[in-house]
Amino acid sequence: MGEDKREIKDITDLPGVGPTTAQKLMEAGYTTLEAIAAATPQEVSQATGIPILTAQKIVDAAREALNIDFKTAYDLKIESMNIKKITTGSRNLDELLGGGIETKTITELFGEFGSGKTQICHQLSVNVQLPEDKGGLEGKAVYVDTEGTFRWERIEQMARGVGLDPDEVMKNIYWIRAINSHHQIAIVDKLFTMVKNDNIKLVVVDSVTSHFRAEFPGRENLAMRQQLLNRHLHQLMRLADIFNVAVVITNQVMARPDVFYGDPTQAVGGHVLGHAPGVRVYLKKSRGNKRIARVVDAPHLPEGETVFAITEWGIRDPE
């Protein structure tokens, strides 16, 4: 069995994958062992037209080749030492997050318009390119823009703020506008190949829910919306885990009419979104350029809040 694992280096090496099946897999975006291993047999069958039993064998073989199997708690401890962190630019915010934005997990930033979600995403797209001793990962970023909020001018300012060449920084950020929810899902499918080959260390989806909300309004469409959103979030979770990248998603808030005390807002997306991110951060406006960040859900972090500032040069501590 160990011999077989060594021999399987490519999808064409998988048992049962001849030229025709390989072509179908590649056309559906399954160009790497990782992409196949991260999918369900149902997803592979649906996307390629391959019978479900064949898809099951192909997925199982890809997982075995990549040694996706039971691990001991000690293995997990060793793996956790490979988790890296990207600085936000604010020491306060980094401390709240246990050192910065983590790889191998999804971090959700949610809050109302103007609370700083997109500003942090821009800053992280710059900071991920910094050397590790400056809080970066010396990697590239992918920015999936669903609402047209990305601004290259802001990237330019932030790059200057951390002493990097703005043009070089912009060349290392791959931007794409997602035009609808199915396109958004297809983009992430493609990332399983792109991330592996291009030193990408950060994937931003800003915002993760807007297309799903617009395309599936009302209670009658809720089940379909949640099902698609669930698939999308699991794609992102697998991407983060398999390739050790940081995934940051933004989300809007909606008012809860049943809440009379405290903050009457909650993140859009219901229980599906509530369980997917590893870290959930609620952002809200304060006075002037100050913003408040609160960790509301993270198994490894205490709940708490802090203040940061949005300055001309980017995310910083308040003066």
Curated annotation (Swiss-Prot):
UniProt entry keywords in alphabetical sequence: ATP-binding, DNA damage, DNA recombination, DNA-binding, Nucleotide-binding
SUPFAM superfamilies: P-loop containing nucleoside triphosphate hydrolases, Rad51 N-terminal domain-like
Tagged with keyword Nucleotide-binding: yes
DNA-binding is among the record's keywords: yes
InterPro entries with a match to the protein in the record: AAA+_ATPase (IPR003593), DNA_recomb/repair_Rad51_C (IPR013632), DNA_recomb/repair_RadA (IPR011938), DNA_recomb/repair_RecA-like (IPR016467), DNA_repair_Rad51/TF_NusA_a-hlx (IPR010995), P-loop_NTPase (IPR027417), RecA_ATP-bd (IPR020588), RecA_monomer-monomer_interface (IPR020587)
Binding site for ATP: G111, E112, F113, G114, S115, G116, K117, T118
One GO-annotated biological process of the protein: DNA repair
One Pfam family matching this protein: Rad51
Organism superkingdom: Archaea
Record protein name field: DNA repair and recombination protein RadA
